[in-house]
């Protein structure tokens, strides 16, 4: 595979970092280092006493981060759901001026056939973001029931043919001595099971997304990170979160809305609305931001990105 296959264009780079409203001497967390696009821009805006803690669970991302030689920067190999534990260990609970999360799978992960994320490239069916932990997709599919697989495809992929696909996958693994172990092998089984093809979308798109989300517990990770964000952030600390599919974006949107919504004071009550709502934890900053047409032309994978920004009060 040549180097251009692994070229990574950071999505909503300036918009996401602008959303952090960087204080030159602030302390920031990039919870999804990836290939370092956001981290490098954050560092360029920090003064000598600023600090950036980057987190990623992908060993390849850790290797990339280790090429950055900067006293203001440190990389930690863990999932972003562990941000509270990281802050506790560093004595930074409630002192973080901003957290950036760029959710989902990165272009290098998709383009590296050996990682098993892509239904367009043949490779081992792995799909783990952290290849040192947990079951691979192939190992899980070898033991899953039709009911459980159908639930995963429906819940995390919103796949209308979930039951058909689950039956085809489980049946193949039960009737063949050689199990499903390759990405293109799984993609073909899924395509053959789907009765109606969408000419704009590969029939395996939703299933691969669903299996990846399940294997990596992506929504659980996001829920934990959101739940603990308010404990971690300093007053006026920013949350800048990019999501790439409706399940993630819905969670982020609902979290921000729930924590920024005040109560309406019934007429006649001797209490001011401002007094009642002084403990609202978040302010939503602006509207959701989508990539420009120019960015989508330059990087088609940015098309589904949504950036939401909020600030702790």
Swiss-Prot record:
Domain of life, per UniProt, equals Bacteria
Record keywords: Iron included?
Answer: no
Q: Give TM regions.
A: none
**UniProt: S-adenosyl-L-methionine binding residues:** 36-38, 56, 80, 102, 109
Q: Which organism is it from?
A: Haemophilus ducreyi (strain 35000HP / ATCC 700724)
EC numbers on record: 2.1.1.199
**Methyltransferase recorded as keyword:** yes
User: Under the cellular component aspect of Gene Ontology, which terms does the record hold?
Assistant: cytoplasm
Q: Any idea what this protein is called?
A: Ribosomal RNA small subunit methyltransferase H
- Family per UniProt? Belongs to the methyltransferase superfamily. RsmH family.
Cystine bridges: none
The cross-references to Pfam families, in alphabetical order and at most eight, read: Methyltransf_5
């Amino acid at each position: 595979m040549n180097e251009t296959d692994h070229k990574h264009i950071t999505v909503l780079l300036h918009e996401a970092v602008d959303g952090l409203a960087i204080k030159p001497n602030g302390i920031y967390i990039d919870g999804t280092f990836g290939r370092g696009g956001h981290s490098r821009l954050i560092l360029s805006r920090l003064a000598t006493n600023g600090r950036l803690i980057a987190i990623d669970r992908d060993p390849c991302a850790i290797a990339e981060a280790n090429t950055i030689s900067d006293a203001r920067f440190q990389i930690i190999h863990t999932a972003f759901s562990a941000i509270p534990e990281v802050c506790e260990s560093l004595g930074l609970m409630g002192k973080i001026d901003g957290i950036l999360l760029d959710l989902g799978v990165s272009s290098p992960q998709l383009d590296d056939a050996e990682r098993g994320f892509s239904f367009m490239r043949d490779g081992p069916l792995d799909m783990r973001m952290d290849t040192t932990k947990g079951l691979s997709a192939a190992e899980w599919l070898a033991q899953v029931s039709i009911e459980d697989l159908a639930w995963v495809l429906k819940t995390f992929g919103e796949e209308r043919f979930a039951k058909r696909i689950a039956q085809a996958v489980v049946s193949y693994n039960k009737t063949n001595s050689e199990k499903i172990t390759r990405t293109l092998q799984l993609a073909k089984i899924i395509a053959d099971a789907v009765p109606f093809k969408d000419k704009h979308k590969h029939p395996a798109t939703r299933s691969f997304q669903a299996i990846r989300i399940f294997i990596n517990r992506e929504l659980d990770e996001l829920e934990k990170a959101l739940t603990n964000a308010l404990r971690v952030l300093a007053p006026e600390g920013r949350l800048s979160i990019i999501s790439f599919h409706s399940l993630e974006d819905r969670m982020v949107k609902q979290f921000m809305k729930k924590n920024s919504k005040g109560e309406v004071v019934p007429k006649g009550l001797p209490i001011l609305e401002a007094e009642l709502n002084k403990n609202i934890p978040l302010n939503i900053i602006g509207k959701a931001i989508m990539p420009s047409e120019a960015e989508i032309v330059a990087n088609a994978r940015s098309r589904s990105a949504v950036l939401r920004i909020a600030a702790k009060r």
